[in-house]
Amino acid sequence: MSTGKVVQIIGAVVDVEFPQDAVPQVYDALKITEGDLEGLVLEVQQQLGGGVVRTIAMGTSDGLRRGLNVVNTGQGIQVPVGVETLGRIMNVLGEPIDEAGPIGEKDRWSIHREAPAYAEQSMSNELLETGIKVIDLVCPFAKGGKVGLFGGAGVGKTVNMMELIRNIAIEHSGYSVFAGVGERTREGNDFYHEMNDSNVLDKVSLVYGQMNEPPGNRLRVAFTGLTMAEKFRDEGRDVLFFVDNIYRYTLAGTEVSALLGRMPSAVGYQPTLAEEMGVLQERITSTNKGSITSIQAVYVPADDLTDPSPATTFAHLDATVVLSRDIASQGIYPAIDPLDSSSRQLDPLVVGTEHYETARGVQTVLQRYKELKDIIAILGMDELSEEDKQTVSRARKIQRYLSQPFFVAEVFTGSPGKYVSLKDTIAGFKGILAGEYDDMPEQAFYMVGGIEEAIEKANKM
C-alpha cells in the first residue's frame, strides 16, 4: 500500500501527491489516515502527472488540510453484498446508518463492474402486473425491463414509486434494492417506515445518498445499490431495483465535472453525460442467471422533456410513464398521461389482441376529446354532433376511471387503496368503450378500483 499527502482541496475535490512509482489507478479508493476526518474515502478521478491524482471525497471535506497522510487501498470502493444487506439502511460505502449494528456480510464487491456481455443477456416478454390501472393498460411493464417515471416537481413521482414498490414488492416474493439518490431524507425515512409497516423490510436493501450529501456520494450511491442488486441477480433471483432519482445522479455528475475543470456542454451539463448514463444503465440488465427489473424516477426540469438529462435517459428504457401537471391540476391521481406514456410491451403479440385494442381504443377516444376541447371552449357542447357528444362523455368517464386510490396515499385521500388486476382493468375500459355504462354519471368513475365499485357508487347517487 503506497502512501501520499493531500496537496490541494477545492470543495469536494482533493488532490493527493504520491511517489512517481506508486501512483494509484483511476477509481482506486484512497483513505485519509490521520486528523479529524480519519477514514474518509477519496475516489481517484484523474491522474494529473507528477505523481498527483485528483480525487472526489465520499463525504464532507470540511476539516481536511494539506499535508495529511493518505493511503491507497489498491482497489475500488468495496461494499457489502448478499442477504445480510436485507432490511438494512446503508450509505454509499455500504456502512450501516440505521444504528442496528454491523452488516456482518460474507462478501464484498467493488462498485465498478463490467456490464454483462451480449451473450449473457436475456430478454423476457413476461408482463409484470402493478395493480395500477393506467400503467397496466397503456404502458405495461416487462419483467426484467427498465421503466422510467418522468415528471416535473410535485406531480407525484415518489408517491407513484412508493405505490409500485408496495404493490410489486408485496405481490412479488423476490428481493428488492432501493437506491435513494439525492432525494429528501424525509422521503427516505417515510419509505423505511412504509416498508416496515408492510412487513416487507426483510426483503429490501436500502442505500441512501441524499440531498445534503456531497456530490461524490450522490454520484456513486446508484452504483452501490446496483452492485447489491447484481449480486442477487447472479445468485439466480429476480430482483427489483428502484432508483429515486436518476436526475440527481446526473446533477451530481454535473457538479463533479465542473469541480474537475471539464468544459460544460449543452445547458451546462457535463460533456460526458451520455457516457455516464450509459455506464449505469448498461449494467441494469437481465442475464441467463436472473433478472433485474428497474423502476427509475426521473425529474424533468421545468417540465421540459427535451432537456438533455431526461432525453438521455429515454433511450435506455423499455417503458416510459409520463406524469402530467395538467392532469394533476384536474385532481386526477395518479397523474399519468395515457397519451404520452408508452411501452414496448404494448404489442398484440405480447399482450394479446384484446388488451392491445382496448388500450388503443382508450387512447383514440382521449385524443379525439383533446382535439374537441378547443371547439367546446369556443362554441360549447351543443354545437357538437351526437357522435362527438358521446365521445366526449366516454372520454370524461375514461379520464376519471384512470384515477385510483393508492395504498400509500390513504392518509391524504381518506379512502382505502385499491389493487386492480389486469383482467378487471381491461374488462372495465372495454365496457366503457362499448357504451355499457353510458347511462352512469361520470363522478361514479372517479377514484374507484374496479368497475363494480363504480356501478355501486352510481347506484348510490
From Swiss-Prot:
Its main location: membrane. InterPro entries: AAA+_ATPase, ATP-synt_VA_C, ATP_synth_F1_bsu, ATPase_a/bsu_AS, ATPase_alpha/beta_chains, ATPase_F1/V1/A1_a/bsu_N, ATPase_F1/V1/A1_a/bsu_N_sf, ATPase_F1/V1/A1_a/bsu_nucl-bd. SMART domains: AAA. It is found in: Cell inner membrane. It catalyses: ATP + H2O + 4 H(+)(in) = ADP + phosphate + 5 H(+)(out). It is a peripheral membrane protein. ATP binds at residues 151-158. Its EC number is 7.1.2.2. Produces ATP from ADP in the presence of a proton gradient across the membrane. The catalytic sites are hosted primarily by the beta subunits. F-type ATPases have 2 components, CF(1) - the catalytic core - and CF(0) - the membrane proton channel. CF(1) has five subunits: alpha(3), beta(3), gamma(1), delta(1), epsilon(1). CF(0) has three main subunits: a(1), b(2) and c(9-12). The alpha and beta chains form an alternating ring which encloses part of the gamma chain. CF(1) is attached to CF(0) by a central stalk formed by the gamma and epsilon chains, while a peripheral stalk is formed by the delta and b chains. This is ATP synthase subunit beta.
